Amino acid sequence: MNLFDIFLKGGIIMWPILLSSIIGLAVSIDRFLMLRKAKINVPAFMVRIRGFIKKKDISGAISYCIEEKSPVANIVRKGLNKYRYGHDRVKDAIENAGSQEISKLEKGLSVLASVAGIAPLLGFLGTVTGMIQAFMTIEELAGAANPSDLAGGIWEALITTAFGLIIGIPALALYNYFLGAVKKLVGEMETVANDVIDVIQDDGRSDADIDDDVEMEL
């Protein structure tokens, strides 16, 4: 008996379980690739960004952010695009960009959580329908059923439960893994956002101090 034969013995409930597994796998692959692209060396990134801002090379900083292609770099880039309008506009742009990037990072996680919850429930539903089938067989045979007569219902009950758990457990584990990775990225985004805002604010204060000194000398 091969895997396909076992699948068929699980009955009609196996098809929605199979569908949920395909959806869960697709979401997991998509999120894995997204997280792989989103990784960035935050300390090294901030060293470069601070250097650009100190030198007033905002276009260079923006170009560097475009090269990095990560959520962290994206929020900094969108903030620096508003650099000429002042500190407050930069802060607002970074906050708005942060909300957008968080939504992108969390995309699909609710679907994966649903798969983790629904797959085992479908398995238990298959258990119920399988047991109903077994008891109907007993009733039809007036209580004279032998084990082979009940095998079909028992097969369905056990196989659907097993496959539901086989799909649900990894889906739950992957959901928690991706959720933790997203939280880590969000933390990095918040840290970088605050650092960039502070650097711009400090740089603005330095310029103001220089202007004051020039006026006093005059």
Predicted regions and their residues:
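Hydrophobic membrane-targeting segments
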Residues: 1-44
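Residue-level signature of catalytic and energy-coupling elements of molecular machines
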Residues: 11, 25, 61, 76, ...
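Alpha-helical transmembrane segments of integral membrane proteins
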Residues: 14-27, 113-123, 167-171
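Alpha-helical transmembrane segments of multi-pass membrane proteins
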Residues: 29-34, 169-181
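Predominantly long cytosolic amphipathic alpha-helical stalk/bundle segments
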Residues: 39-125, 129-141, 174-218
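Glycine-rich helix-loop "coupling/hinge" segments at transmembrane-helix boundaries
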Residues: 137-156
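Hydrophobic alpha-helical transmembrane segments of polytopic membrane proteins
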Residues: 155-173
